């Protein structure tokens, strides 16, 4: 199962963080567009008339360092296949939230 609809919160929850192809979501308003994959990564640009100008290209990683052990990891991407207790993405109207928990630390990363 890749995910499910959460009727109470009116969002789709992606549970499979290693799908065959990326899940893409587009967030926008009158001036800007943001593309997000299941990790919160993607492109952002602003519209200027019929032109667009890139604001951000591709990577929005959140890194965490454990000061006791020196371990550094990406809370939203999990490049090292660490045994996260929670690693999921909540996709709602005008936001996308990546939630992860590893070694007792919960990180919530929201793009809106």
Placement of each model-derived feature along the sequence:
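Anionic coordination/interaction segments
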Residues: 1-112
């Amino acid at each position: 199962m890749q995910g499910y609809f959460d009727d109470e919160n009116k969002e789709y929850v992606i549970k499979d963080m290693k799908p065959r192809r990326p899940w893409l979501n587009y967030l926008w308003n009158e001036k800007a567009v943001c593309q997000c994959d299941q990790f919160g990564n993607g492109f952002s640009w602003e519209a200027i008339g019929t032109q667009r100008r890139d604001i951000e290209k591709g990577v929005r990683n959140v890194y965490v360092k454990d000061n006791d052990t020196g371990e550094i990891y990406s809370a939203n991407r999990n490049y090292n296949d660490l045994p996260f207790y929670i690693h999921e993405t909540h996709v709602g109207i005008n936001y996308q939230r990546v939630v992860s928990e590893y070694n007792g630390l919960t990180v919530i990363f929201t793009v809106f």
